[in-house]
Amino acid sequence: MATKIFSLLMLLALSTCVANATIFPQCSQAPIASLLPPYLPSIIASICENPALQPYRLQQAIAASNIPLSPLLFQQSPALSLVQSLVQTIRAQQLQQLVLPLINQVALANLSPYSQQQQFLPFNQLSTLNPAAYLQQQLLPFSQLATAYSQQQQLLPFNQLAALNPAAYLQQQILLPFSQLAAANRASFLTQQQLLPFYQQFAANPATLLQLQQLLPFVQLALTDPAASYQQHIIGGALF
């Protein structure tokens, strides 16, 4: 008998709980709305308009509020990871907007040193990879300067001679091919040495020197082969 009475009491209590219970649909906004703090913006109220827009509008509300939310809300929200990602993205964008102008100002202020660093970057890499090659690169301008200086030292007497005595410098220029010929062909240079008095005699008279230049092949032929030169003279006399 006691068991039946206890069973009836249990059924009565269960029926009372069922009668007083409120069933919330899965897409209903009532559980979330009841957990939202009262100080959030009024945009939260518009979430209940359409359940399909619940996650999107909730993200907008969180981004606009920038206020810590209740832990129960995050437990009830199905878009927890998406909301957290959105909040982190918004904070990163805000930080970027604050920091980017400062970076631009620093870059503009230090544009010249930055440009110089970019120009010297290959040399720095070369010095790290191959110190010997980097040292040669550093000495290259000095090598070029030494070569140019050596050439200037060789030409210095001629330059001084040209400044002090233009006539003597002109004679040096006339005799320069003979000096080169002496270095290349000694026999031809000896022949030229035999003709040197004629060059010195007619150096002051360009017209006579030009005639001598025209007669030079015949003179060289006379020195190297007198018989052939004599035949040339006979043939020339017969023609004229």
Curated annotation (Swiss-Prot):
Pfam families cross-referenced by the UniProt entry: Zein
Q: What does this protein do?
A: Zeins are major seed storage proteins.
Highest taxon, organism lineage: Eukaryota
Q: Which UniProt keywords apply?
A: Repeat, Seed storage protein, Signal, Storage protein
Subunit record text: Interacts with OP10 (via N-terminus).
The family this protein is said to belong to: Belongs to the zein family.
Keyword Repressor in annotation? no
Any further remark recorded for this protein: The alpha zeins of 19 kDa and 22 kDa account for 70% of the total zein fraction. They are encoded by a large multigene family. Structurally, 22K and 19K zeins are composed of nine adjacent, topologically antiparallel helices clustered within a distorted cylinder.
Q: What species is given as this protein's source? A: Zea mays (Maize)
Q: Which InterPro entries match?
A: Maize_Zein_Storage, Zein
The protein's GO terms of the molecular function aspect are:
nutrient reservoir activity
Record's signal peptide: 1-21
User: What is the protein's given name?
Assistant: Zein-alpha 19C2
